Protein backbone atom coordinates (compact mmCIF):
# COMPACT_ATOMS: atom_id res chain seq x y z
CA UNK A 1 0.00 0.00 0.00
CA UNK A 2 1.47 3.40 -0.98
CA UNK A 3 2.40 5.89 1.71
CA UNK A 4 0.25 8.99 2.02
CA UNK A 5 1.81 11.97 3.74
CA UNK A 6 0.44 15.29 4.93
CA UNK A 7 1.75 18.80 4.34
CA UNK A 8 2.21 20.47 7.75
CA UNK A 9 4.07 23.72 6.99
CA UNK A 10 4.76 26.09 4.08
CA UNK A 11 7.50 28.73 3.97
CA UNK A 12 8.44 31.31 1.34
CA UNK A 13 11.62 33.39 1.24
CA UNK A 14 11.30 36.56 -0.83
CA UNK A 15 15.03 37.32 -0.91
CA UNK A 16 18.07 35.06 -0.93
CA UNK A 17 19.18 35.42 2.70
CA UNK A 18 15.89 36.48 4.25
CA UNK A 19 13.92 34.47 6.80
CA UNK A 20 11.19 32.20 5.49
CA UNK A 21 7.69 33.49 6.09
CA UNK A 22 5.05 30.98 7.14
CA UNK A 23 2.12 30.60 4.73
CA UNK A 24 -1.12 28.63 4.84
CA UNK A 25 -1.38 28.40 1.04
CA UNK A 26 0.91 29.07 -1.90
CA UNK A 27 0.68 28.91 -5.67
CA UNK A 28 2.98 26.37 -7.33
CA UNK A 29 3.93 27.65 -10.79
CA UNK A 30 4.67 24.98 -13.39
CA UNK A 31 8.37 24.88 -14.26
CA UNK A 32 9.10 27.95 -12.14
CA UNK A 33 8.68 27.48 -8.39
CA UNK A 34 6.51 28.82 -5.60
CA UNK A 35 4.91 32.24 -5.98
CA UNK A 36 6.86 34.80 -3.95
CA UNK A 37 9.90 32.57 -3.34
CA UNK A 38 13.31 33.83 -4.43
CA UNK A 39 14.04 30.52 -6.23
CA UNK A 40 11.07 31.05 -8.57
CA UNK A 41 12.26 30.89 -12.17
CA UNK A 42 15.80 29.72 -11.40
CA UNK A 43 16.94 26.09 -11.47
CA UNK A 44 14.05 23.82 -12.41
CA UNK A 45 15.58 20.96 -10.42
CA UNK A 46 15.34 22.92 -7.17
CA UNK A 47 12.04 24.76 -7.61
CA UNK A 48 10.74 23.41 -4.30
CA UNK A 49 12.48 21.98 -1.24
CA UNK A 50 10.82 19.57 1.18
CA UNK A 51 11.80 18.07 4.54
CA UNK A 52 10.22 15.48 6.81
CA UNK A 53 9.01 16.57 10.25
CA UNK A 54 10.70 13.48 11.68
CA UNK A 55 14.05 14.73 10.42
CA UNK A 56 13.48 18.10 12.09
CA UNK A 57 12.75 16.22 15.31
CA UNK A 58 15.92 14.10 14.94
CA UNK A 59 18.11 17.14 14.28
CA UNK A 60 16.61 18.92 17.29
CA UNK A 61 17.20 15.91 19.52
CA UNK A 62 20.85 15.69 18.49
CA UNK A 63 21.41 19.44 18.96
CA UNK A 64 19.39 19.53 22.19
CA UNK A 65 16.87 22.15 21.06
CA UNK A 66 13.66 22.57 19.09
CA UNK A 67 14.27 23.22 15.39
CA UNK A 68 11.80 25.41 13.52
CA UNK A 69 11.13 24.81 9.81
CA UNK A 70 12.46 28.32 9.04
CA UNK A 71 15.87 27.30 10.40
CA UNK A 72 16.35 24.63 7.71
CA UNK A 73 15.37 26.95 4.83
CA UNK A 74 13.06 24.35 3.25
CA UNK A 75 9.75 25.34 1.62
CA UNK A 76 7.54 22.45 2.69
CA UNK A 77 7.42 20.24 5.78
CA UNK A 78 5.65 16.89 5.51
CA UNK A 79 4.94 13.92 7.72
CA UNK A 80 3.89 10.34 7.05
CA UNK A 81 5.89 9.77 3.86
CA UNK A 82 9.53 8.97 3.08
CA UNK A 83 10.65 11.82 0.83
CA UNK A 84 13.83 10.10 -0.32
CA UNK A 85 11.68 7.36 -1.89
CA UNK A 86 10.30 10.12 -4.15
CA UNK A 87 13.62 10.85 -5.90
CA UNK A 88 13.05 10.45 -9.67
CA UNK A 89 9.34 9.85 -8.98
CA UNK A 90 6.25 11.94 -9.68
CA UNK A 91 4.04 12.73 -6.71
CA UNK A 92 0.99 14.84 -6.02
CA UNK A 93 0.32 17.46 -3.39
CA UNK A 94 -3.39 18.03 -2.93
CA UNK A 95 -5.70 17.71 -5.92
CA UNK A 96 -3.86 19.92 -8.42
CA UNK A 97 -0.09 19.98 -8.02
CA UNK A 98 2.33 17.39 -9.40
CA UNK A 99 6.03 17.45 -8.54
CA UNK A 100 8.97 15.29 -9.52
CA UNK A 101 11.65 14.56 -6.95
CA UNK A 102 15.03 15.58 -8.37
CA UNK A 103 17.47 14.72 -5.59
CA UNK A 104 18.67 15.12 -2.04
CA UNK A 105 18.49 18.63 -0.58
CA UNK A 106 21.96 18.90 0.92
CA UNK A 107 22.53 21.34 3.79
CA UNK A 108 24.37 24.59 3.18
CA UNK A 109 26.89 26.37 5.40
CA UNK A 110 24.10 28.58 6.78
CA UNK A 111 23.08 25.63 8.96
CA UNK A 112 25.98 26.57 11.27
CA UNK A 113 24.41 30.00 11.72
CA UNK A 114 20.77 28.90 11.83
CA UNK A 115 21.16 25.78 13.97
CA UNK A 116 24.37 26.56 15.83
CA UNK A 117 27.75 24.83 15.93
CA UNK A 118 27.53 21.38 14.38
CA UNK A 119 24.29 22.20 12.56
CA UNK A 120 25.72 21.49 9.12
CA UNK A 121 26.98 18.03 10.05
CA UNK A 122 23.78 17.11 11.88
CA UNK A 123 21.70 18.05 8.81
CA UNK A 124 23.79 15.82 6.51
CA UNK A 125 21.52 12.97 5.42
CA UNK A 126 18.49 14.75 6.90
CA UNK A 127 18.22 17.66 4.44
CA UNK A 128 15.17 16.46 2.55
CA UNK A 129 14.26 16.54 -1.12
CA UNK A 130 14.50 18.93 -4.06
CA UNK A 131 11.73 18.85 -6.65
CA UNK A 132 10.48 20.54 -9.78
CA UNK A 133 6.89 21.46 -10.53
CA UNK A 134 5.35 19.51 -13.41
CA UNK A 135 1.80 20.84 -12.91
CA UNK A 136 0.99 23.96 -10.95
CA UNK A 137 -1.89 24.87 -8.69
CA UNK A 138 -2.66 25.70 -5.08
CA UNK A 139 -0.82 24.02 -2.21
CA UNK A 140 -2.28 24.31 1.29
CA UNK A 141 -1.60 23.06 4.80
CA UNK A 142 -3.23 19.66 5.29
CA UNK A 143 -2.88 18.61 1.64
CA UNK A 144 -2.15 14.93 1.10
CA UNK A 145 1.11 13.92 -0.58
CA UNK A 146 1.39 10.66 -2.46
CA UNK A 147 3.37 8.87 -5.12
CA UNK A 148 1.80 8.73 -8.57
CA UNK A 149 2.21 5.11 -9.71
CA UNK A 150 4.27 4.79 -12.89
CA UNK A 151 2.45 3.62 -15.99
CA UNK A 152 5.22 1.19 -16.96
Label each PLM-derived region with a short phrase:
Residues 1-152:
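Metal-cofactor-dependent catalytic cores
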Amino acid sequence: MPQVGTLTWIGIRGKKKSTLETQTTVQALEGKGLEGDHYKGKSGKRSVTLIQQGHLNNVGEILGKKISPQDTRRNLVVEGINLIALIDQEFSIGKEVILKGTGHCHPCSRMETNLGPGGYNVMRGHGGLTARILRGGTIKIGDKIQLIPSKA
